Amino acid sequence: MDLVLKRAFDIFSSLSALLVLAPFLLFVALLIKLDSPGPVLFKQTRWGKNCKAIKVYKFRSMRTDLCDVSGVAQTVKNDPRITRIGAILRRTNVDELPQLLNVLLGHMSVVGPRCHAIGMRAGGMLYEELVPEYHQRHAMRPGMTGLAQMRGLRGPTDRPAKARARIASDLYYVGNFSIVMDMRIIFGTVVSELTRGKGF
């Protein structure tokens, strides 16, 4: 029943948000076009449910000539690839709003383990090598936010310890999922965004 409620919530919330935010999303698209040449949206292949590859949508925040389509090259502070508008979009997480379309289409969920690019590494090791149970996190749809993000585990995972901490949170979520937990994560994410700062 919890999974049925989760999908119903995903459809209702993503469709409502897309309709309400449509004028704002169009305004952001215009700013991106005026700021730098290239497409408004950026598509990237990432892990989906049951280890199926999915295309995830984001507002383009980087220069097209320097963009890493694979997503393996993680973003760092003061990254020279990021455009002026892109810096604002990433800092406020507005760049991720197009993922509402992924949620509506059933590729993603509002809450779940964050979708990783295929071939992610930390300390030179693939995530699958760092944590043998890594792919268990893909038993559920990836989310726009998750337990790890609520706990403030953000930014580049350049060290194995950082990657393991996030994956541990993801595995805990998959093993203990409930609709009540999802509501707590949504509330906790909002609090975390307001108190711990934004991304880059």
Swiss-Prot record:
Pfam families: Bac_transf (PF02397). GO terms for biological process: polysaccharide biosynthetic process. It comes from Rhizobium leguminosarum bv. phaseoli. GO terms for molecular function: phosphotransferase activity, for other substituted phosphate groups. This is Exopolysaccharide production protein PSS. InterPro entries: Bact_transf. Keywords: Exopolysaccharide synthesis, Nodulation. Belongs to the bacterial sugar transferase family. It comes from the Bacteria.
